[in-house]
A protein has these predicted regions:
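Short beta-strand scaffold segments in enzyme catalytic cores
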Residues: 28-42, 134
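Short secondary-structure boundary/capping segments within folded domains
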Residues: 21-24, 32-34, 90
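Zn2+-dependent cytidine deaminase-like catalytic core
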Residues: 5-6, 12-13, 41-160
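Short, basic/aromatic recognition patches
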Residues: 2-28
Length: 160
């Protein structure tokens, strides 16, 4: 009998560690891209290189403007975890890969059971050639989303 952690939870555990580098004051996300059991890249949400992070300045623009979660991401100082992971990899290495995503509330550190890539990240994931996104729901449970679903159900990318 094999008592080892499943590969999915192994990679989700790594994404959970990556999110500890997040500088967002609202939500912390970690992402890793894996192809053929090899980690291609990692990413967490934070300001673009060389710019001040929300954690450095001690304020969140979206919070100051009372923008609800899931809206008006263009006003966010951060680059999302998925985007940072994609930026750090070559497209060739991502074709057919899986993206593992974990989100936590920055204040409570509780898992976000409803974590989901935003519309902008979904478009980047599609264009990167990634096949599926695995999102942690609980410490041992996850959901798998075939990226082809986002392509076939074009309107679903824009549902909020």
């Amino acid at each position: 009998m094999d008592n080892r952690t499943s590969k999915q939870n192994y990679y989700l555990d790594i994404a959970d560690s990556v999110l500890e580098r997040s500088t967002c004051l609202r939500r912390k996300y970690g992402a890793i891209i894996v192809r053929n059991d090899e980690i291609i890249s990692t990413g967490y949400n934070g300001a673009p290189r060389g710019r001040k992070n929300c954690s450095d300045i001690g304020t969140c623009t979206r919070e100051q403007l009372r923008i609800p979660s899931g809206e008006r991401y263009e006003l966010c100082r951060s680059v999302h975890a998925e985007a940072n992971a994609i930026i750090s990899a070559s497209r060739q290495s991502m074709i057919g890969a899986s993206l593992y995503l974990v989100g936590r509330d920055a204040a409570t550190n509780e898992l976000l059971s409803d974590a989901m890539s935003c519309a902008m990240c979904k478009r980047q994931i599609i264009n990167a050639g990634i096949d599926r996104v695995i999102i942690r729901i609980t410490p041992t449970e996850y959901r798998t989303i075939p990226v082809s679903d986002w392509v076939e159900n074009d309107d679903s990318i824009f549902s909020f």
